[in-house]
Amino acid sequence: MFRRYADTLTSEGFIRIVIHAVGRMKAGPERELADRYLDRAAKAGPAIGMELAGVSEIPESRARSTLERKREEGRKLLDFAQGGALILLDERGKNLSSRELGDRFASFRDSGFRQIVMAIGGPDGHDDAVRAAADLSISFGAQTWPHQLVRVMLAEQLYRLITILSGHPYHRD
């Protein structure tokens, strides 16, 4: 399933942001909150050259072994990331401030990348091949978070970093 938040194709000087998540997010308050932040990000992003393209949900692998599940899901994530900056949400990733994350997004945009792929792994995490291919790996802290909350937190951080880069007062230091 792919939920689109922007109806335009990426134009010159814009970078597309797309989220690929292993697993489905069921209807409920978490999905509503994530959609609310993603909609805000989609509306605010074009002013600073960022377009939120949408969210793709990748079915969880049904393979028997953990290793094979991670590999199968990882191959799909890597296929989607071709030609773009790949940012993983991973418990082993860097713990960046919102400003630091905004700076990284601006750097990808200004370096000529046309797409940023945000990858959320399945219950078993990311395959080592995906970790090795990532341009950046970030964490929302040392704790383990439920998939639904990670999606909400990512949506809010995307909106927040867009407001930081645009000078909007939503974020306060």
From Swiss-Prot:
Its main location: cytoplasm. It comes from the Bacteria. Its EC number is 2.1.1.177. It catalyses: pseudouridine(1915) in 23S rRNA + S-adenosyl-L-methionine = N(3)-methylpseudouridine(1915) in 23S rRNA + S-adenosyl-L-homocysteine + H(+). It is found in: Cytoplasm. Homodimer. HAMAP family: 23SrRNA_methyltr_H (MF_00658). PANTHER family: METHYLTRANSFERASE, RIBOSOMAL RNA LARGE SUBUNIT METHYLTRANSFERASE H. Specifically methylates the pseudouridine at position 1915 (m3Psi1915) in 23S rRNA. This is Ribosomal RNA large subunit methyltransferase H. The lineage of its organism: Bacteria, Pseudomonadati, Pseudomonadota, Alphaproteobacteria, Hyphomicrobiales. The gene is rlmH.
